[in-house]
């Protein structure tokens, strides 16, 4: 498991405005919790805690 930005297909983050949206998204994917990080490296994006290794995360490189 790891703490990371959860990713959609093609290495893109989930953009967000509310912590509740990210917490729901993260926990549905097996994480312990999550929140919406504002003005972070990838803008306003969901960050998950203890996300399982089989769930895609944002890695260096472009979002296609």
UniProtKB/Swiss-Prot annotation:
CDD domains, sorted: neurotoxins_LC_scorpion
Molecular function GO terms recorded: sodium channel inhibitor activity; toxin activity
Cellular component, GO annotation: extracellular region
Gene3D superfamilies for the chain: Knottin, scorpion toxin-like (3.30.30.10)
Comment, domains: Has the structural arrangement of an alpha-helix connected to antiparallel beta-sheets by disulfide bonds (CS-alpha/beta).
Function: Alpha toxins bind voltage-independently at site-3 of sodium channels (Nav) and inhibit the inactivation of the activated channels, thereby blocking neuronal transmission. This contractive toxin is highly toxic both to mammals and insects.
Protein name: Alpha-insect toxin Lqq3
Organism of provenance: Leiurus quinquestriatus quinquestriatus
